């Protein structure tokens, strides 16, 4: 049973890689998000824990899932590895800690043109919706010192995580920069978008998420 499960998971990831190879995504202007938009509605977000960008905590992302038997993602070969949402390390960010309210995740990297500047947009919207919506900015595979300097120079106060080896970006099918995931409370995907957004456009996505959350809770 485990062998068959491993084969299915392997084929799924291979399919995502093939699609990513055949589709070139350019920054800005929107378009389809590889991976995220191909997933079904209410897709449960994979658990992960990463170092906070400005912290002194070092290491790669922890993507060990809580339940290896029912997870749609492979678990680490080391069965003793602590699941991401069970770690308690100073300077770490766990995605599950954001699941108590609607959540926006921004995936980005400095090689993606103006992606760093797009986080200024996220910061402004974060300030507008602070308390009612969670925000997580996740830098993928950049130099850590460069990230720390960006946080300092831009004055970001929103949570900023660091995905050093790109494990989280791979799990989430990030195919362009910036990629945004809009998430229901509890950690299931509501929608996704790719490309640069204005404050008004990102706020529009947040409002749509809030309305969808209200409808879901009323049903």
Give the residues covered by each predicted segment.
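Short beta-strand-to-loop junctions in surface cap/lid or active-site-entrance loops
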Residues: 93-98
């Amino acid at each position: 049973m485990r062998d068959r499960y491993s084969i299915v998971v392997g084929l799924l990831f291979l399919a995502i890689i093939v699609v990513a190879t055949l589709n070139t995504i350019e920054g800005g202007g929107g378009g389809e998000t590889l991976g995220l938009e191909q997933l079904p509605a209410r897709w449960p977000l994979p658990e992960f824990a990463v170092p906070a960008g400005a912290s002194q905590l070092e290491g790669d992302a922890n993507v060990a899932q809580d339940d290896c038997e029912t997870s749609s993602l492979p678990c680490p070969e080391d069965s003793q590895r602590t699941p991401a949402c069970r770690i308690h390390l100073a300077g770490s960010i766990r995605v599950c800690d954001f699941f108590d309210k609607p959540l926006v995740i921004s995936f980005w990297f400095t090689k993606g043109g103006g992606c760093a500047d797009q986080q200024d947009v996220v910061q402004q919207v974060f300030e507008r919706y602070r308390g009612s919506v969670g925000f997580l900015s996740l830098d993928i595979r950049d130099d850590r010192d460069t990230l720390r300097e960006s946080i300092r120079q831009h004055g970001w106060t929103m949570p900023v995580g660091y995905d050093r080896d790109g494990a989280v970006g791979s799990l989430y099918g990030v195919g362009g920069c910036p990629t945004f995931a809009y998430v229901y409370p509890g950690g299931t995907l509501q929608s996704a978008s790719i490309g640069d957004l204005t404050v008004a456009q990102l706020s529009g996505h947040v409002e749509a998420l809030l309305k969808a959350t209200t409808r879901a809770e009323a049903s």
